[in-house]
Amino acid sequence: PVTIEDQGSFMAGGVTITAPGVYKDSEPTNYDGETLHGDAAYVFWQRPVNARKNALIFLHGYGQSGKTWETTPDGRDGFQNIFLAKGWATYIVDEPRRGRAGQSTVPAELKAQPQDQLWFNNFRIGQYPIIFDGMAFPRDEESLRQFFHQMTPDTGKFDVEVVAKAMEAVIDHTGDNVLITHSAGGGPGWLAA
């Protein structure tokens, strides 16, 4: 078992925009002059007792959130727990405009678009519904359901620069670290590192 010395969460990076006009406290539905804080990353972190010097920062790929790093679809330990048990502090990121960092400064239309089979194929699990031989992906219905449910829509247009700036703030906040990215997280990761 892992003994956690400390844990918490924070928002990193982001911008503030202000609507034109003058804010009037007496008119709560008049948005003139109001501000919007958005495009920040959300970070959940844990530090085990006697943690190693460098922390590990995990940035997910497209269509995902920090959930990607927590546990596998069948409930086995994910990278977060595996590395905590090996003495690393872990910082699990939801990139701006996704998941728990959903406050966007740009509009987006969220569509209920059926695309489970696209995710199945793009993650190279197999050619839906057949799982490739030799895959560690579990073959039960509940695990597949869990996998599909963890897909997360963008709440604003994906912008590699916005994500990179937020990741720079995460990196600055954590001190000595190693940044680990998955798939579409690689571009912003390279820019931020």
Q: How would you name each of these model-derived features?
A:
Residues 76-102:
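Conserved alpha/beta-hydrolase
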